[in-house]
């Protein structure tokens, strides 16, 4: 394919503007369909018949309308009348894509031509071959003022731009971004800013953005739906912040339900439900905290009482041990006195000789525990 393009380099358009448009696209990546010479002749005849008005202008399932052949920079087809007709027949394949008029024949600027290309690629015309017929009529009408070489170069530029846009699939997305530039460039597609005119971009940047925005255009289109109404979700949030500032947590808890309902007159139902839920949550939290505090306080009281009781028990134990020691001492003393008294009296008499005798039974009766 590269050798064929190199051989036909002499037939390429020589206009600087046309070459600038063509250089913006990598023509080597587009596949060129190889067709026999006999098929080219049949297709050329079919194009001449359609241009003459002998066939219907709507596309039909014919060999010349189903698959448009690839652009050829070959010699003029036999039987053509003028050079302008020859150039238009060489590029009649472009009618398979969304049609455009010749911008130079209508006096369009290059920016207007690119804008028309983009708009027409998004809204194609109903007739597939109407553009070719109108192009011939306009070429015949403007034949005296527009040279044939410029007509051919303009057709080549238009065909190259349409082919690149169709291959990249970026023309519809670019059109969407052009009509809705405020949707944002989040997806990467090139859209004009608010203050820029649609045709103010340079021709090279406009054509490159038309061809290269296919990858990011989808993302931008998807993000446009989410950015259409960013203020709807913020309205409720603003009201919520306002009421949160108006009622503090302490006021919500201490305020009666009747007073709260009076304060919330005219407020949306969602906001009322949210504030009441917040009030219920705060009251439950306060109730749980108070219960926890009471439990902790009661535990501290019980622990203090327990410590006091333990101290009393220890004191009582100490008293018991002291009393036991006293008892043991008195018992030992009693036993000594009893043994000493019986030894002194011995067998002298049965009557007691001293008053200690009367003390022993009484002391023994009181000390027995």
Swiss-Prot record:
Family classification: Belongs to the bZIP family. Maf subfamily.
Region spans: Leucine-zipper: 302-323
Known function: Might be a transcriptional trans-activator.
Keyword Transcription carried by entry: yes
Segments of this protein annotated with the region Disordered: 57-85, 169-243, 341-369
Organism: Avian musculoaponeurotic fibrosarcoma virus AS42
Predominant location: host cell
Keyword Transcription regulation: yes
InterPro entries listed in its UniProt record: bZIP, bZIP_Maf, bZIP_sf, Maf_TF_N, TF_DNA-bd_sf, Transcription_factor_Maf_fam
Protein name in the entry: Transforming protein Maf
GO cellular component, one term: host cell nucleus
Highest rank taxon of the organism: Viruses
Biased composition (Gly residues): 184-193, 212-226
Limits of the bZIP domain: 274-337
UniProt miscellaneous comment: This protein is synthesized as an Env-Maf polyprotein.
One GO MF term attached to the UniProt entry: RNA polymerase II cis-regulatory region sequence-specific DNA binding
Entry keywords, A to Z: DNA-binding, Host nucleus, Oncogene, Transcription, Transcription regulation
Gene, per the UniProt record: V-MAF
Residue ranges with Polar residues bias: 345-354
